């Protein structure tokens, strides 16, 4: 049986490399900013643990403080030796359960020109299995195109009019203005007249 537990700075030091292996360096948060976020409570580092063996099988980094009541699933990584065994699916179920009292869960899927073409499509299908829907956005992370998907829980998936504020609010809690300008570029979605 799997469970989820909140981790701290020691685990971040040990497992930050796992995120670096799974995510493009251009979308990585500086480790110091993540330490700051863990300290001020604006993020949680979560471990998915096998109760029987007490082994950590997956990690997630989630921005939890927001004026709007949503959380941001920033990273989810499964340990390399236990991939393709349903751990990602179980991890998502546990994350959904942990944040069931929130308005919803937001996920960002980035794409850079040199990425494998089907990579983001595969991640979209994976998230859609858990009720995530695509939100229209004008968003880039580290210069790469970012697709936003939202799992509505108590709130709405219709965040397009304020999505640029929601995303900026998450990052402003642990990134300096300089780091935000370098990493996050999100603008209000312009509606075309029909």
Spans of model-derived segments:
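A conserved beta-strand-loop-helix scaffold within acyl/acetyltransferase catalytic domains
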Residues: 23-77
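Conserved acetyl-CoA-binding loop-helix of GNAT-fold acetyltransferases
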Residues: 78, 84-98
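Short, charged/polar, Gly/Pro-enriched secondary-structure boundary elements
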Residues: 154-159
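Conserved GNAT acetyl-CoA-binding A-motif
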Residues: 99-118
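Short amphipathic alpha-helix that is part of the acyltransferase structural core
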Residues: 1-33, 49, 161-169, 173, ...
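Conserved N-terminal glycine/acidic-rich loop preference
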Residues: 67, 112-132
């Amino acid at each position: 049986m799997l469970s989820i537990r909140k981790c701290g700075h020691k685990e971040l030091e040990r497992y930050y490399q796992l995120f670096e292996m799974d995510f493009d360096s251009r979308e990585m948060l500086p480790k110091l900013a993540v330490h700051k976020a863990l300290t001020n409570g604006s993020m949680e580092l979560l471990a998915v643990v096998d109760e029987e063996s007490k082994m950590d099988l997956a990690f997630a980094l989630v921005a939890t403080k927001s004026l709007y009541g949503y959380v941001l699933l920033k990273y989810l990584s499964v340990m390399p030796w236990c991939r393709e065994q349903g751990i990602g699916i179980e991890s998502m179920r546990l994350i959904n359960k942990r944040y069931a009292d929130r308005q919803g869960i937001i996920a960002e899927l980035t794409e850079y020109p040199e990425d494998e073409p089907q990579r983001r499509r595969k991640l979209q299908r994976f998230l859609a299995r858990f009720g995530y829907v695509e939100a229209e956005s004008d968003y880039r992370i580290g210069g790469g195109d970012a697709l936003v998907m939202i799992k509505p829980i108590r709130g709405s998936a219709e965040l397009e009019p304020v999505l640029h504020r929601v995303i900026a609010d998450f990052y402003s809690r642990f990134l300096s203005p300089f780091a935000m300008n370098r990493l996050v570029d999100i603008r209000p979605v312009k509606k075309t007249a029909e």
